């Protein structure tokens, strides 16, 4: 079996790279390894970067002029001054012009952290300024910068050569604008095809729902659904109410797949889940007459309602604590046992206060209030 042999010739432009190798330099590498050498030696050439005049070539013609590149193309170019004595650069072509956008980005050395260059972003507009039509062609222009990094190079030499990286910005469905359709249960997606105008495509409602569920910004993070759409839960009416009626109303998976918002109201949430709101408002059945709040003192043959009423009357007539008749609190009465056997016997209750004791309590209360008011 013959093994292919690749010959690397570092001196010519006719050499080929093995499959898988791409030219993807960093911003710092473009400045220090390519642009600096071109500024110091105008005859320097690279097998990956071609020399072109950007003012005489349209953006869609540049891929054919490049030496290599699939989606990004690199070029050496000289700045064309708009005026002989000015510093403004002529960026116009026959079909349009390049317009700068945003701020220039600084490029620092990874070893010395010194400023070595600047990167400017430009967008190509078809037509003439200021009514040009924006296209999807973008260019990154690299130039030398740094007072201490290139102190041995004159200012005119540093501004003479630049490296331009040209690429075509993709604007597909990931960046397409989604607008509501007029009818038919779908949505209209605006997709730009590159050089041509944007086209509007009608998509089904199932696809448009996927577009609408995407968050509009990073601060609005989509919350997970409150219910798992892949799980089918079974709710019955008997589990939601106190009634003994067994009406098996099972919630199907189609009702659960509905997305429940965190801020949905109770009627909308229960309607989406297929549940009956009235089943939650049913009152429990009334307690029977044989219900006893004190099962320890229960008697099977005696009515408990009369016993509980007598206990409340005795409890409401207890004397105040701290009164002069505190001795009556220690006196107790032994209640007789209830009829029928199994009753309560030997229970001690305080005797109700008499009228004289109540008058003494009122006198003590007025005396205490007089002390507070006269203080």
Curated annotation (Swiss-Prot):
**Where does the UniProt entry say this protein principally localizes?**
nucleus
Q: Where is the NAC domain?
A: 17-169
Provide the induction entry: By BRM and SYD, at the chromatin level, and conferring a very specific spatial expression pattern. Precise spatial regulation by post-transcriptional repression directed by the microRNA miR164.
DNA-binding region in chain numbering? 116-175
Annotated segments matching region Involved in transactivation activity:
210-247, 373-375
Composition bias (Low complexity) maps to 215-228
Q: Which InterPro entries match?
A: NAC-dom, NAC_dom_sf
Keyword entries, A-Z: Developmental protein, DNA-binding, Nucleus, Transcription, Transcription regulation
Q: Its Gene Ontology molecular function terms?
A: DNA-binding transcription factor activity; transcription cis-regulatory region binding
Keyword Acetylation in annotation: no
Where is the protein situated, by its record's location annotation? Answer: Nucleus
Task: Classify the source by domain of life.
Answer: Eukaryota
Note down the stretches annotated as region Disordered. 175-228
For domains, the record's comment is: The NAC domain includes a DNA-binding domain and a dimerization domain, and confers the specificity of the transactivated target genes.
Can you say what this protein is called?
Protein CUP-SHAPED COTYLEDON 2
Species in which this protein is naturally found: Arabidopsis thaliana
């Amino acid at each position: 079996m013959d093994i292919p042999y690749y010959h690397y010739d570092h001196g010519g432009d006719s050499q080929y790279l093995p499959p898988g190798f791409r030219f993807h330099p960093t911003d710092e590498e473009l400045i220090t390894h390519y642009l600096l050498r071109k500024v110091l030696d105008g005859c320097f050439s690279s097998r990956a970067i071609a020399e072109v005049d950007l003012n005489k070539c349209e953006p869609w013609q540049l891929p054919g002029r490049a030496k290599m590149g699939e989606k990004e193309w690199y070029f050496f170019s000289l700045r064309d001054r708009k005026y002989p004595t000015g510093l403004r650069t002529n960026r116009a072509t026959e079909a349009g012009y390049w317009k700068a956008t945003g701020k220039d980005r600084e490029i620092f050395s990874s070893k010395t952290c010194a400023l070595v260059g600047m990167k400017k972003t430009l967008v190509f507009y078809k037509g003439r300024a200021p009514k040009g039509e924006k296209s999807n062609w973008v260019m990154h222009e690299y130039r030398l910068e740094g007072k201490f990094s290139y102190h041995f190079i004159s200012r005119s030499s540093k501004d003479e050569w630049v490296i331009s990286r040209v690429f075509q910005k993709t604007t597909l469905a990931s960046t397409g604008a989604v607008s509501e359709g007029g009818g038919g249960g779908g949505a209209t997606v605006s997709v730009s095809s590159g050089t041509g105008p944007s086209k509007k495509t009608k998509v089904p409602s199932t696809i448009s729902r996927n577009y609408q569920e995407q968050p509009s910004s990073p601060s609005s993070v989509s919350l997970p659904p409150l219910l798992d759409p892949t799980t089918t839960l079974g709710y019955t009416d008997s589990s939601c109410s106190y009634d003994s009626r067994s009406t098996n109303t099972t919630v199907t998976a189609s009702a659960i797949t509905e997305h429940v918002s965190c801020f949905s109201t109770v009627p909308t949430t229960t309607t989406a889940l297929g549940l009956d709101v009235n089943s939650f408002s049913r009152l429990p059945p009334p307690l029977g007459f044989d219900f006893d709040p004190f099962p320890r003192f229960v008697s099977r043959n005696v009515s408990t309602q009369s016993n509980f009423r007598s206990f409340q009357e005795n409890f409401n007539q207890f004397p105040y604590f701290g009164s002069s008749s505190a001795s009556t609190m220690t006196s107790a009465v032994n209640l007789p046992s209830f009829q029928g056997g199994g009753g309560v016997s030997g229970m001690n209750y305080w005797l109700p206060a008499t009228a004289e004791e109540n008058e003494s309590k009122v006198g003590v209360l007025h005396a205490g209030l007089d002390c507070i008011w006269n203080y």
